[in-house]
Amino acid sequence: MQYSLGIDAGGTYTDAAIIRDSDGEVVAASKALTTYPDPLHGMKTAIDRLDKPLLKAVKLVSLSTTLSTNTILENTGFPVGLVLVGDYIIPGDLPTNYWIAVAGGHDSDGEELKLLDLDSVKAFALKVKDKVSAFAVSSYFSTRNPEHELTVKQAVLKLTGHPVVCGHELSRDLGAFERAITAFLNAQLIPITHKFAGSITEECKSRGIKANLLMLKCDGSVVGIEEALEKPIETIFSGPAASLVGASHLSRRETCAVIDIGGTSTDVSMMQAGIPELSNRGAVVGGWQTRVRAIRMETSATGGDSHVWVKKDRFNVGPKRVIPLCRASVLYPGFLEKLRKSRVPRSHLSESVQATKFFVRTGFEPLELNKQERLIYRYIGEEPVSFGDLLGKLKQRPSSIALDSLIRKRLIQAIGFTPTDALHVLGEYNEWDTEAAFSGATMLGRLLKQDPADFSSGVKQRVAGNMALDLVAYLVEGMARPEIEKVLSGGHFTKFRVELPVVLLGGPARAYRESLESLIDAEFLVPEYADVGNAIGALVGKGIKRVEVLIKTRKVSKAGGNEEKKEHGGEKASESGVIEDTLHREMENEFIVFSPAGRAKFNVHGEALEYAEKLGRKLVMEYMTCAGLDNENLKVELSRKNLAPKSWSGPPMETKLVFVGVGTPLPPSRTFHSNKSPDEGQTNRKNYKT
């Protein structure tokens, strides 16, 4: 009997699940707290809680992890040298001090605009080679002709031996600056991803697991570890992608919306006909716009660990994240007694100052602290301390700015009342210490003249309302959120109806189902194993490869020159993708095919089209083979779009062909099997441990 193991390292929890290959049954699952900065320790704990005999029969391991995302957000990637080729405008700051802009680049037809200044590139590479761990290069219109990027790559690799990432290798979209950022971030992640993959491989070997290793990408597809090592940037936001794929699989719904209720945030996304819906724009991470294709999602900073705090006779939810009181009481013996004794004057109340808020060290070593940070950090130890404790030790009010800075630097963590605590009070989620949650609700509710149950019910309803708002905002793009809130308020005798199933994932998913049904008319499903759906999503993700091929028509003189350039100074196109129609004299057509494999020229449109179709399918098949995916059941769909102005005659000005191949890394017989309907409870599990 063979099995497969899926692991997802999320913002709060790391989930693991084992699926039996013969029938797709989930036979074991576990959870552990995610560890920072290295998620490997949390993964080890989750694996430790699975049955050893099953682990030794595992033949495939698939991962989704926050490693890439956290590295970029925390700016802890390796130093990279950036080479910009061409005369394009840099719209903002660059993410590195090690960069150079040199002459070169191509036009929209892939013709060379200027000779590449390779000497300057070589001098730069030699100058910074001991200061960086990798290089990135982005050339103007490299998507139409990657020659200059490849030349730079070969030269820098020969001189330094460092990895070199090209923009055209990561994206076929226009936007030279965004490709440069994407290539830079990818280069930053390569050393970290190599180390992580090596650690996972060694961990599997030490447990007797002889398995192929896959990673989930942010578009919901899986990829072999070799490609993941080359393009780690594509694994950012793989967690939301895992939840989407897992929800579709567990609910047996190929088309559905998904609400993933995590500890840090709540994410809304959508699956259509078994394929994740992707964003038209690239993913934004750490404030940087990339050209990485990711799932389209609506994200709010409201999750199970969002801080609930009171000020001016009202409670607020988030946006900051804390350790729930109920969990802190289990992690730190004696915490409950400290909580009960904590007091804060009503006049001092703020997000940082609550009777229910505490602080504790994380164990990371401090590096650069200012005077205020050092002073506060000295009085925060390995046991939680309250605001009142700090006030007594400092003899002055602790700086909220310094506390927030210490939290951002991951030197301390905050503890406070959360939606998870509210569910414990209501008896709808009982994973940790209910008594601590009840004490917190009593203290905060007293400020609003509410009993613990009423206060907790209000928190739960607020969180459910935020989920409903995010769902409608996702499905009805462009609708103003205040208008959505008016309908959801229930005061207009109206209600939104969603005509596709909505799958809820996350530990507390079942607790919010009834509240969501009161707000929106929809079929809400909570499948079995909803609380480890991300781990299952990491495992059952399909192999999806998108290849774009562009055929562009241009006019050339019969002598072979580009008449358009002679008459009009070249086609008026830029990396923004804007193309201006021009008038043409009596000339011949030439058809240029642009693809990831390079460019090719034809004199007959039909020949160009035939070449493009064969090439696109070939590239999809080659990718699937390299990724170790099942080619026998591979489906390749082709969509074609022609572009031509009204005055245009003859073959289209442009023809865009998009090939989408869908395969599976696992036997095609694998489908989720359960005797229960998708919305039945999570009972009678096998080997489920927390």
Regions found by a protein language model. Give the residues of each.
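N-terminally biased helix-coil "hinge/interface" segments that flank
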Residues: 1-690
